[in-house]
């Protein structure tokens, strides 16, 4: 059974690919003598009235497909407006015509939109599945006409009589569907509430017949526009054969398979190949591509960010359909990205239109002929700049930022005005205002203040700018070289120097444009959270509790973010467009999900990427739910004070150290705040001597700050002369029975083992104070990122992390703490899946090395 299922899945992948390869091979043979350039010239020479009528019929054909959705609405009694049904239908069907595998592209879209309008999702799944399968019923009706010779195809398939079996097979779909529907009606007749979903089979048959009739009309009119006045019965017969081939091929939209079969069929009837190919191109434009572009407009308007999140996180884009099909998974990914980026795609097309208008010859005599030539050249350079901005901007427009909206409107208006002033361009004059109006209507979708760019996105933007500018020079230069002898001077703006001037202007204007908007919106954006407030922090930690890193909030180099219920707190710093949260939330555990969700939402809205530094294993599942990956930074050493003792054979080394310092009359002291200035000054001298030429670190590491040291007790060792030789500040963990340590510093002439002696005495003191656990701080693992199976990103991140110049040797730290036989607990970095781990680690180490004023 499993082997059969795997074989079927493989066949579903291989079959469409094989069909595509066959179509490509066969098309190459058939179209060897065809000039695509000549085809475009023929289309360009057609009567505008014929083109308009063809596009209108194509739009009406796609609109007619909304009958399916209206049948679905009334059969399931969906509480949705007719206008919304029409838009959903247009999006689903136009995307189906381009991307659909036998109608599956529309299944997920319909499910996503309609599930909000019914409580019976099971009935909706069945209804959509019924709708999708009913799209074959109309083709089955026409197949019956073919089999009955009402639509003659004998001349087309006389060389391949086996095709009759395929036609008859499709003809049988209608009676079989009617039979199955009748059986279901009988079974449902005995069930309670059986009339809830009425049998819409005949309504679907009518809708399907209208769909295929309209589609056939489009291609018939395309042939008519090319001067092929064929018998409509023969055209529809060939159309039905080609449509069956397109459906069987499973190729998205039937591209290639339908087109090739229709071409071969019409050639069998004696019509000229070039005219047929041009007709097929016109058919695709009118029935597929133009409705698809209009579908993008509808999608951009109807698909809000929340809707897209539901689609993207939906584990099954096509419920009740086998989701293990790799083709469906790939199609789902493509469909989601196209829908989410529909507006970006439209703006990108606008950029291409403006770029084309800049590259092509300009007829100066048609619009504003009295503009001075220097001004005309200025407008040309500004048009090029607008085009390049519109090509780059979709990267940020995809993120729906307010800045991208303003920039897009500015660039579109600029592109329209400058294109108009420098010369007549039909596409720019008619298309750009439509896109501007669309953007204005969708203004409410742009809710984010800013958006952070990944390194890859920045590189892509620069590469796109460079390639577009290069292509402008290439195309415009080619046109100038080929056409300068043909066009009169007054009709032409371009020359080699004009192209160079426009390029230089764009190189200056485009970066300046982005810089200005970045600065303006950066100043408008209010910072997240609030500045460090020691009094509020102390009150919060004493009431709600904290963790091993909460006390570092008193350093003043981090901002605070409180949950809306006031029961949870995050400490964080900022580096570039990253917000680095130190440790897990402090406060009541029940409010951790709330504070994380609120913080991440606000950071997302203001364009920041968030990472969490030194989180514990206990809450990793919570971060994973928010889409985070993890990298193990190291481990914290916890000494169990209940079992800590200096007695026994295994503790002989520690006992010897303690006894030596007692013999040498070293004394241990713990003082509580407030501390005198003289005491802190003495500690400052020790700290400066210990630092030497090194710079203080911060964020996750304490630094010598009098106000910070006044917040907790300080333990120190004095020699026989009464001089302080080493000290460490006690760091409360705001958890019952737990205590930690932060700064650990000693004089340069302190004897060996002084820090061991200090720790031993601190353990004994903490035990007397009723503490049960002593946190000695974090030490990295020597093998993090060095295993053979580690990813390269982890290896590189480990190199960065382990070689930053901290106060202590990391390998020495671990060896120092290991002698106390602690329990090691993992510490992790939580970072976004779409962010570079190496870059993230580099930014974290930079943040740790920043000064206090630069971190908040």
UniProtKB/Swiss-Prot annotation:
It comes from the Bacteria. It holds the Pfam family LPG_synthase_TM. Its EC number is 2.3.2.3. Disruption phenotype: Cells lacking this gene lack lysyl-phosphatidylglycerol in their membranes. They also display an increased sensitivity to the antibiotics nisin and daptomycin. Cells appear normal, no effect on flotillin cluster numbers or size. Keywords: Antibiotic resistance, Cell membrane, Lipid metabolism, Membrane, Transferase, Transmembrane, Transmembrane helix. It catalyses: L-lysyl-tRNA(Lys) + a 1,2-diacyl-sn-glycero-3-phospho-(1'-sn-glycerol) = a 1,2-diacyl-sn-glycero-3-phospho-1'-(3'-O-L-lysyl)-sn-glycerol + tRNA(Lys). It is a multi-pass membrane protein. One of its GO terms (biological process) is phospholipid homeostasis. The keyword Transmembrane helix applies. GO terms for cellular component: plasma membrane. It is found in: Cell membrane. Catalyzes the transfer of a lysyl group from L-lysyl-tRNA(Lys) to membrane-bound phosphatidylglycerol (PG), which produces lysylphosphatidylglycerol (LPG), one of the components of the bacterial membrane with a positive net charge. LPG synthesis contributes to the resistance to cationic antimicrobial peptides (CAMPs) and likely protects B.subtilis against its own CAMPs and against those produced by competiting microorganisms (bacteriocins). In fact, the modification of anionic phosphatidylglycerol with positively charged L-lysine results in repulsion of the peptides. Belongs to the LPG synthase family. PANTHER family: PHOSPHATIDYLGLYCEROL LYSYLTRANSFERASE. NCBIfam families: bifunc_MprF. This is Phosphatidylglycerol lysyltransferase. The lineage of its organism: Bacteria, Bacillati, Bacillota, Bacilli, Bacillales.
């Amino acid at each position: 059974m499993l082997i059969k299922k795997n074989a079927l899945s493989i066949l579903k992948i291989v079959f469409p690919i094989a069909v595509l390869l066959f179509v490509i091979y066969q098309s190459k043979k058939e179209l060897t003598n065809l000039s695509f350039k000549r085809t475009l010239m023929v289309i360009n020479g057609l009567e505008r009235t014929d083109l308009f009528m063809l596009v209108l019929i194509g739009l009406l054909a796609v609109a007619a497909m909304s009958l399916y959705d209206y049948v679905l609405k009334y059969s399931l009694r969906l509480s949705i407006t007719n206008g919304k049904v029409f838009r959903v239908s247009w999006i689903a069907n136009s995307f189906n015509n381009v991307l659909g595998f036998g109608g599956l592209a529309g299944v997920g879209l319909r499910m996503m939109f309609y599930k909000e309008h019914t409580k019976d999702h099971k009935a909706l799944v069945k209804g959509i599945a019924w709708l999708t399968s009913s799209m074959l019923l109309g083709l089955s009706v026409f197949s019956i006409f073919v089999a009955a010779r009402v639509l003659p195809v004998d001349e087309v398939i006389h060389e391949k009589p086996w095709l009759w079996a395929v036609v008859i097979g499709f003809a049988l779909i209608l009676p079989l569907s009617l039979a199955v529907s009748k059986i279901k009606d009988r079974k449902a007749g005995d069930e309670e509430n059986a009339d809830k979903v009425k049998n819409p089979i005949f309504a679907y048959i009518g809708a399907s017949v209208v769909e295929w009739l309209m589609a056939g009309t489009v291609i018939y009119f395309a042939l008519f526009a090319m001067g092929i006045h064929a018998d409509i019965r023969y055209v529809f017969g060939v159309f039905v054969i080609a449509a069956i081939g397109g459906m069987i091929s499973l190729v998205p939209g039937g591209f290639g398979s339908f087109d090739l079969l229709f071409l071969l069929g019409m050639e069998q009837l004696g019509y000229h190949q070039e005219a047929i190919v041009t007709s097929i191109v016109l058919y695709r434009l009118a029935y597929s591509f133009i409705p698809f572009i209009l579908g993008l407009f509808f999608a951009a308007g109807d698909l809000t960010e929340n809707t897209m999140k539901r689609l993207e996180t939906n584990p099954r884009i096509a419920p009740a359909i086998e989701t293990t099909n790799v083709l469906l998974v790939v199609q789902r990914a493509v469909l989601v990205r196209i829908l989410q980026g529909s507006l970006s795609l439209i703006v990108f097309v606008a950029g291409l239109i403006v770029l084309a208008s800049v590259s092509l010859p300009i007829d100066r005599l048609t619009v504003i002929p009295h503009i001075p030539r220097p001004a005309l050249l200025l407008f040309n350079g500004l048009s090029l700049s607008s085009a390049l901005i519109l090509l780059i901007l979709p990267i940020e427009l995809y993120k729906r930022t307010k800045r991208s909206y303003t920039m897009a409107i500015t660039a579109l208006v600029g592109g329209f005005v400058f294109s108009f002033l420098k010369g007549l361009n039909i596409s720019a004059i008619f298309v750009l205002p439509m896109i501007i109006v669309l953007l204005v209507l969708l203004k409410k979708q742009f809710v984010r203040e800013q958006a952070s760019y990944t390194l890859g996105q920045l590189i892509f933007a620069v590469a796109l700018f460079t390639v577009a500018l290069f292509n402008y020079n290439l195309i415009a230069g080619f046109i100038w070289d080929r056409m300068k002898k043909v066009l009169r001077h007054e009709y032409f703006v371009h020359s080699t120097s004009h192209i160079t001037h426009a390029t230089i202007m764009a190189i200056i204007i485009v970066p300046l444009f982005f810089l200005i908007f970045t600065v303006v919106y950066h100043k408008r954006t209010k910072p997240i959270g609030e500045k460090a407030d020691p009094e509020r922090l102390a009150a919060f930690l004493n009431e709600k509790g904290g963790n091993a890193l909460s006390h570092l909030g008193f350093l003043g180099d981090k901002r605070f973010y409180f949950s809306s219920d006031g029961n949870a707190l995050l400490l964080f710093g900022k580096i570039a467009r990253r917000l680095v949260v130190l440790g897990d939330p402090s406060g009541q555990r029940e409010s951790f999900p709330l504070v994380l969700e609120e913080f991440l939402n606000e950071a997302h809205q203001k364009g920041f990427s968030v990472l969490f530094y030194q989180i514990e294993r206990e809450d990793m599942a919570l971060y994973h739910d928010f889409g985070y990956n993890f990298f193990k930074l190291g481990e914290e050493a916890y000494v169990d004070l209940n079992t800590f003792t200096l007695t026994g054979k295994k503790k002989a080394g520690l006992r010897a150290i303690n006894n030596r310092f007692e013999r040498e009359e070293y004394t241990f002291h713990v003082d509580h705040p407030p501390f005198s200035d003289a005491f802190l000054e003495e500690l400052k001298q020790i700290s400066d001597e210990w630092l030497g030429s090194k710079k203080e670190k911060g964020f996750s590491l304490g630094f010598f700050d009098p106000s910070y040291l006044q917040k907790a007790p300080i333990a120190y060792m004095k020699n026989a002369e009464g001089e302080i030789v080493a000290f460490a500040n006690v760091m409360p963990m705001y958890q019952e029975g737990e205590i930690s340590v932060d700064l650990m510093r000693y004089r340069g002439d302190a004897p060996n083992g002084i820090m061991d002696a200090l720790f031993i005495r601190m353990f004994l003191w903490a035990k007397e104070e009723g503490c049960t656990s002593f946190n000695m701080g974090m030490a990295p693992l020597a093998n993090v990122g060095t295993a053979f199976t580690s990813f390269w990103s982890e290896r590189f991140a480990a190199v960065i992390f382990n070689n930053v110049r901290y106060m202590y040797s990391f390998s020495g730290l671990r060896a120092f703490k290991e002698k106390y036989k602690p329990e090691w607990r993992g510490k992790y970095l939580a970072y976004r899946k779409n962010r570079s781990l190496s870059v993230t680690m580099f930014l974290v180490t930079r943040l740790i090395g920043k000064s206090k004023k630069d971190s908040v």
